[in-house]
Regions:
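Flexible, polar/acidic helix-loop-strand segments at domain edges
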Residues: 331-405, 598-604
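Conserved, well-structured interaction surfaces
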Residues: 43, 47-48, 76-145, 159-197, ...
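Long, intrinsically disordered, low-complexity segments
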Residues: 23-26, 96-99, 176, 253, ...
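Membrane-proximal, proline-rich intrinsically disordered regions
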Residues: 24-65, 318, 322-323, 331, ...
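Extended ligand-binding clefts on enzyme/binding-domain cores
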Residues: 253, 257-369, 468
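Short coil/turn linking the two alpha-helices of tandem helical-hairpin repeats
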Residues: 142-144, 149, 192, 213-222, ...
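Bacterial Sec-dependent N-terminal signal peptides
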Residues: 2-8, 13, 18-44, 177, ...
Length: 604
């Protein structure tokens, strides 16, 4: 095997499967090395190179971990960007330009004599795949930084002006992103029956996400110009919503995907549910990786729990709001699951939950607030206490969806509602279909809502007046919970402050310093104590004296668990500038030293 391919294969793991690795540093390649010309002359070798780019989709636990430290999922440690004191001086990250270089390098080779032995069809397909990855990477960076320099070629080592050009308007960058994704949509011929590789539908999905994000980010954050004050001229908000709707509609009309009947199977099956999953990560029980074991993951680095404020947004099974029910605010943990959206009990532990044949209440030592996640967890692997000596050898074998059809339906519904084009037919096709799959009944499946839900409006979206948009946002929260979109959704909806202000509240408990039977089965389960002398033998004893951040608060005659962190560690700036990362001051200084300008984002 030639030297170049050895370099590639030593870094690109798992071949044509989802690699989830850092790809090779193509800047190391020397065109004069023996065998260099062979790398891009073989379709197999080129595909190996492209497979190294799949790490850009994240690890199999990326979605789960990305939703930590949001409004509905507390954490001990938050992103530096959302801590008080974050500034251009403390910022250290500025783009992922090594990845952009790699994409451009491969594109350069595919358009050169190095790829002369490839057929025109092979070359076109490979170029389309690489442009998909470049478009996705730039879209990710637009979300993080806004304006960016655009590079569509390999920079010469002596091209100092090119290397140090200032950022261009995000409006211009989005035009380039959509050009890349449109090329991928029109030219990718590769298919992926097991949903582990990019395809035309993956490109459409990325276009849908990018346009929906950009439209709502501009609308709800009142962003109309670049950091330098240049007005956007390529796309209006309406243009972007329309593009998002069109991309989603193409996937819908393609007829390749539909909703699976068993929602939980999406997250527990060994093989990806390709009826609904557009792109996913295939895993295996005998390969130790970051997904193994999801139950271990949910028990480490407490607190790992949903909040009660968010759990309250799950509807009743008949499609009516739980928060319209008299006395909902003081419901016990046992009672609040009664007649609820079935997805609630499939997302968190519920009264009567069992593993290994034994009833199990939430593990409050890890899930402080009582809503312990089980969405991705194989229940038979739930015992991570060490009591089972063989447990250490058990690993999750369930694969993980990355992009799925339900999100397409929700994006289509949102874009149509924002455009003022929502009707009963679209509602039934999208939100209604998702709720029906979940087991919800009633008119909310077929009729566009007309009554604003005051709980959603008060606790989450005070500036939204459309009942339909509120319900679509409810449905995104419930359906896509712990799938890695929450932070992005809040920021694009102009609700970033919820990352700081949303209460991290938990279940209601009857009393402290006494043993409690949470699930009503006649056996005491836990004692929440403020006085260590009040611990009770034979139950889980959980301190609520603030020593771990966990306390109790009065809630209409009951006690409610609350998790608190230092306010400086959970911060949102009043001027809203945290919608974007800072450009590190050291980068700006380095440009200035060489006589160039690198524009900072507003507020820093």
């Amino acid at each position: 095997m030639d030297t170049i391919m050895k370099k590639i294969l030593s870094i690109i793991a798992l071949g044509a499967a989802f690699a989830f690795t850092v790809s090779c540093d193509l800047s190391e390649y020397n065109p004069n090395e023996p065998g260099y010309e062979k790398v891009f002359s073989s379709p197999t070798n080129v595909q190996y190179v492209i497979n190294g780019f799949y790490g850009g989709f994240g690890s199999v636990t990326n979605a789960y971990s990305k939703d930590a430290a949001t409004d509905y999922f507390p954490a001990q440690t938050l992103s530096a960007r959302f801590q008080k004191g974050y500034s251009a001086t403390s910022a250290s990250s500025w783009g992922e330009w090594d990845d952009i270089y790699k994409y451009n390098y491969v594109l350069n080779q595919l358009n050169s004599s190095a790829a002369a032995e490839l057929s025109a069809a092979e070359k076109d397909d490979f170029i389309a795949q690489v442009r998909l990855f470049r478009g996705k990477k730039y879209y990710d960076m637009v979300k993080q930084y806004g304006d960016l320099p655009w590079f569509d070629h390999v920079i010469s080592p002596v091209a100092t002006d090119d290397e140090h050009k200032d950022r261009e308007s995000r409006d211009i960058i989005m035009k380039h992103v959509l050009e890349d994704l449109d090329y991928a949509i029109g030219h990718i011929t590769a298919t992926s029956p097991d949903a582990t590789c990019v395809s035309k539908e993956v490109a459409l999905f990325l276009k849908m996400r990018a346009c929906l994000y950009e439209a709502s980010f501009r609308k709800y954050n009142n962003v109309t110009a670049s950091a330098k004050g240049e007005a956007f001229t390529n796309y209006t908000v309406e243009d972007l919503y329309a593009l998002a709707a069109d991309a989603a509609k193409q996937i819908i009309d393609g007829g390749k995907y539909s909703l699976v009947s068993d929602w939980r199977s999406l997250f527990l099956s060994d093989n990806l549910q390709t009826k609904e999953v557009i792109l996913g990560a295939q895993t295996a029980a005998n390969i130790q990786g970051s997904q193994n074991n999801f139950f271990v993951y949910t028990k480490q680095n407490a607190p790992k729990s949903l909040t009660r404020t968010f759990v309250n947004t799950f509807l009743m099974k008949d499609g009516t709001p739980y928060t319209d029910k008299s006395g909902y605010a003081t419901d016990s943990w046992k009672d609040e699951f009664t007649n609820r959206d079935p997805r609630l009990a499939l997302t968190v532990r519920y009264p009567g939950y069992k593993f290994a044949g034994e009833t199990a209440v939430p593990d409050f030592g890890a899930s402080f607030l009582g809503y312990q996640i089980r969405k991705f967890c194989l229940d038979q692997y739930a015992d991570t206490s060490g009591a089972d000596p063989d447990e250490k050898d058990k690993h999750n074998s369930n694969s993980t969806p990355i992009f799925r059809y339900a999100e397409v339906l929700l994006a289509y519904a949102e874009a149509k509602a924002e455009l003022g084009q929502m009707d009963n037919a679209v509602w039934a096709q999208t939100v209604g279909a998702i709720r029906q799959r979940a087991g919800i009944t009633g008119s909310s499946l077929t009729t566009v809502p007309s009554t604003v839900d005051n709980y959603l409006k008060t606790n989450y979206y005070p500036d939204v007046t459309s009942a339909a948009i509120l319900e679509i946002r409810r449905e995104r929260g419930v359906e896509l919970c712990m799938e890695g979109v929450r932070e992005s959704d809040l920021i694009r909806w102009g609700c970033g402050k919820l990352l700081s202000t949303a209460p991290w509240d938990g279940i209601n408990v009857a009393a402290v310093n006494t043993a409690l039977d949470l699930d009503g089965n006649g056996t005491n389960d836990v004692c929440f104590y403020t006085d260590a002398s009040k611990k009770v033998d034979g139950v889980a004893n959980i301190a609520v004296d603030g020593s771990t951040g966990l306390t109790v608060a009065d809630n209409g005659g009951k006690k409610q668990l609350m998790y608190n962190v230092d306010p400086d560690l959970r911060y949102w700036a009043p001027d809203n500038h945290l919608i974007l990362d800072a450009i590190p001051s050291q980068e700006i200084a380095a440009y200035k030293k060489l006589g160039y300008t690198l524009t900072q984002n507003p507020g820093y």
